[in-house]
C-alpha cells in the first residue's frame, strides 16, 4: 500500500514538472518569434495609382501634383509617420481585511422531576461553549512603467472614416544582442502634427512591444525550474 501511494506521488510530481517545463518552453518560443525581417512588419509599399488619361493632350497631370501650400502629413498607404513614444503608467492598490467573530453559548442547569437541579458529586449539570476567531490580512501593490523615444511607422491602411492603421518596428543591434520596438494601432489624421509626428497616447488600440534577444536578454530570463516554483502550480 505504501509503495502504491509513493508511486502515485511520483506520478503526480512528474506530471506537474512536465507541465512546468512545457509552459516554460512555450514562453521561450513565444519570445524567440520576434526576429528581424519579419514579413508581418515588412515595409508597406505605396499603392499604384491608375494613370489618368488627359483628353486635352496636355502633359500636365494635376492628380500627381502636390500643392505648395499643403502640409506634409501622411494620409496615404505607404506614407511614413513618426510616433513619439511617451508612455507612463502608475498603479497602486491597497487591500486590508480584518475579521473578528466571537460566539458564546450557555446551557442552564439541568433540572429533574419537580424542578430540582440534577447534580453529580454536588455539582449541578450545566454547559458552556465559547468560540473566538480572528483573521487579519494586508496587501499592497505598487507598479510603474515608462517608455520614451520615437519610432517611424508606415500607414498600413486608410479606413473609410479617414482613420489610418499604422504599423512599424525598429531594431537596434548591440554587442550582446538585439533590442526592438514594435508598434501597431489606429490614428486620426487630424491628430497628426504639422511636422508629421504624433504622440503615442493618441494611438487607439495601440500595441507597443519593447523587448530584446541575445545573451543580455537571456541573463534576465528566469529558468524553467524557478518559474515552476513561482507559479500557481507550486502547492506551497
Swiss-Prot record:
Q: What is its main location?
A: membrane
Q: Which GO terms describe its cellular component?
A: bacterial-type flagellum basal body, distal rod, L ring; cell outer membrane
Q: Name one GO biological process term.
A: bacterial-type flagellum-dependent cell motility
| Protein name as annotated | Flagellar L-ring protein
Sorted keywords for this record are: Bacterial flagellum, Cell outer membrane, Lipoprotein, Membrane, Palmitate, Signal
Tell me the NCBIfam families matching this sequence. PRK00249.1-4, PRK12698.1
**Lipid attachment, kind N-palmitoyl cysteine:** 25
Q: Which organism is it from?
A: Colwellia psychrerythraea (strain 34H / ATCC BAA-681)
Q: Which gene encodes it?
A: flgH
Span of the signal peptide? 1-24
* Complex formation: The basal body constitutes a major portion of the flagellar organelle and consists of four rings (L,P,S, and M) mounted on a central rod.
Q: Where in the cell is it found?
A: Cell outer membrane; Bacterial flagellum basal body
Q: Which domain of life is it from?
A: Bacteria
Its biological purpose: Assembles around the rod to form the L-ring and probably protects the motor/basal body from shearing forces during rotation.
Q: Source taxonomy lineage?
A: Bacteria, Pseudomonadati, Pseudomonadota, Gammaproteobacteria, Alteromonadales
Q: Which GO terms describe its molecular function?
A: cytoskeletal motor activity
Amino acid at each position: 500500500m505504501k509503495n502504491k501511494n509513493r508511486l502515485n506521488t511520483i506520478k503526480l510530481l512528474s506530471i506537474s514538472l512536465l507541465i512546468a517545463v512545457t509552459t516554460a518552453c512555450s514562453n521561450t518560443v513565444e519570445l524567440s518569434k520576434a526576429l528581424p525581417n519579419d514579413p508581418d512588419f515588412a515595409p508597406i509599399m505605396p499603392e499604384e495609382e491608375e494613370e489618368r488619361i488627359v483628353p486635352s493632350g496636355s502633359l500636365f497631370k494635376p492628380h500627381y501634383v502636390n500643392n505648395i501650400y499643403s502640409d506634409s502629413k501622411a494620409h496615404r498607404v505607404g506614407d511614413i509617420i513618426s510616433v513619439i513614444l511617451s508612455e507612463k503608467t502608475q498603479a497602486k492598490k491597497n487591500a486590508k481585511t480584518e475579521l473578528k467573530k466571537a460566539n458564546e453559548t450557555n446551557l442552564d442547569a439541568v433540572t429533574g422531576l419537580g424542578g430540582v437541579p440534577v447534580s453529580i458529586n454536588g455539582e449541578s449539570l450545566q454547559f458552556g461553549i465559547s468560540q473566538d476567531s480572528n483573521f487579519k490580512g494586508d496587501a499592497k501593490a505598487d507598479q510603474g512603467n515608462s517608455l520614451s523615444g520615437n519610432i517611424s511607422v508606415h500607414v498600413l491602411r486608410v479606413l473609410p472614416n479617414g482613420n489610418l492603421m499604422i504599423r512599424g518596428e525598429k531594431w537596434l543591434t548591440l554587442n550582446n544582442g538585439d533590442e526592438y520596438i514594435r508598434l501597431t494601432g489606429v490614428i486620426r489624421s487630424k491628430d497628426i502634427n504639422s511636422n508629421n509626428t504624433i504622440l503615442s497616447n493618441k494611438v487607439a488600440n495601440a500595441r507597443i512591444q519593447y523587448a530584446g534577444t541575445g545573451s543580455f536578454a537571456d541573463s534576465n530570463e528566469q529558468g524553467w525550474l524557478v518559474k515552476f516554483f513561482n507559479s500557481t502550480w507550486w502547492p506551497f
